[in-house]
Amino acid sequence: MDFSLLLSSYATVWSNPEVLLMTFIGALGGVLLGAIPGMTATMGVALLIPFSFGMDLIPSIGLLLGIYCGGMYGGSISAILIHAPGTPAAAATLLDGYPMCKKGQAGKALSVAMFASFCGGVIGALVMTFLSPLVADMAMNFGPGEMFMLAVFGLSVIVAISGKSVAKGLISAFFSMLLCTVGLDPTNGIPRFITTKQTGLLDGFQFIPTLIGLFAVSEVIAGVERIIRGEEHEQKSNEKITNVLPDWKTIKKIWPNILSGGLIGTFIGAIPGAGGDIAVFVSYGASKSASKHPELYGTGIPNGVAATESANNGCSGGAMIPLLSLGVPGDSVTAILLGAFIMKGITPGPMMYVTELPTVYRVFAALMLANLCMLVVGCLGVRFFAKIVSVEKKMLYPIILVISLLGAFSINKNAFDVGVCVAFGIIGWLMNKYEFPLSPILLALILGPMCEKNFVRYMNIQRGNFFAITTSPIAMVFATVAILVIVYSVYNQSKINKRAAANAAQENA
């Protein structure tokens, strides 16, 4: 690692007024959005990525990373104050955060959440800085066969993120893989499933309009449906916040939870598709198991909040490791960041550490800056963020819809993209309605073309002999890990479903 270049990259990024401003705005927007139940960091990044096209790479990445980190912390605000996690990853925070609020310790819970989230983010950024170059060095030996098996490994993670039904997750992924085949064949340029008159689909379905439709427009449609049915209940909080940071006594008590949570979050975040919602519960369970008083967890103690929030934001650095070093997104937000890099003419992966090393180091600096901005935003606004949970959804949904459609249009200045955005909004709404997960679609949409291109290249090199791939140790490692991920995920999900069925039967008895 070139430490002089790393330090100069930090100096360049942290002294750039545009980067500072964009990252701060991103952190502020992320916290505000994350505090509203149902509004995730993924949605925030998807909404704003079209508006980053006119910026240079690092200011735009700073904006998106600010939203990412801010949104991860923002979800804890509503979880603590009104027992409604703003993001899925904040679900474990309410286990101790909300009981603290009911004890009259809302300010303390929010300050612990903010401090732990910042520390977890810093741990994740540091691990990313020193680990991702090592992974990239290993990946320099990858050829088309290894890249194909890497994509297969990434696709195998779909089973892990499919939720209650593996079958529905696979159906979502299969649907997305079919979408990837629309447009010009990447190897011979022959149009597939379109005519030459359908110019809007020559390059396939544009990533950003599809993404905005699936994650933002679908939520607007679902929200309007809830309002019409009278199922959308406005939630308010009247808590007065006094402390902006935990006192030294509390910090001494929670630092082991922060350290372990940050490391757990980072390493789970580095597994493509795992995500913060898994990391927070693993961290919470580990913290509870290691405690001398596990019976206190769930009654409202700072240790529980610290363990979950440090893991929550630690995932941000972890998820960037496979993105930068392998070109495989670690979660849905880094999948969007992958699209942002590609649209700026930079392809993440091992070659990025050879041809774009200063850019890589500036991304490291931008992530650290994003966590610092999140802390500043939290300190300045923690007394007022409680008001965010009281925003009427009737006012919020039209604003989100307008921003979504403008974002879809702004990419190519093409009304066709707006139609694609709306169409995928309806598809996303229907899939959510019938409990088909959306994350597998996103993962398959990113990895599908990578899988196809490298498979065709490999088969051409090997003259049709696919089984020659068994001679590559790296490819076989990815294949083995993919099989283990699938088997473990199916086994684990079947256990969860059986336990849920047994609990339901017990309640009905």
Model-based region annotation:
Residues 58-62, 99-116, 292-304, 332-335, ...:
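Membrane-interface alpha-helices at helix entry/exit sites of multi-pass transporters
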Residues 32-42, 80-91, 123-127, 268-278, ...:
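Short helix-coil transition sites and intra-membrane helix breaks within transmembrane domains
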Residues 68-79, 86, 301-326, 330, ...:
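A structural-propensity feature for long, helix-poor, extended segments
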Residues 41-51, 64, 79-99, 130, ...:
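Re-entrant/interfacial helical elements at transmembrane boundaries that shape
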Residues 1-60, 133, 140, 194-301, ...:
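Helix-loop-helix hairpins and the membrane-proximal interhelical loops
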Residues 27-41, 70-83, 158-163, 262-272, ...:
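Transmembrane alpha-helix interface/packing and boundary motifs in multi-pass membrane proteins
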Residues 47, 81-109, 134, 138, ...:
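Flexible loop linkers connecting adjacent transmembrane helices
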Residues 111-228, 343-498:
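Membrane-embedded alpha-helical modules
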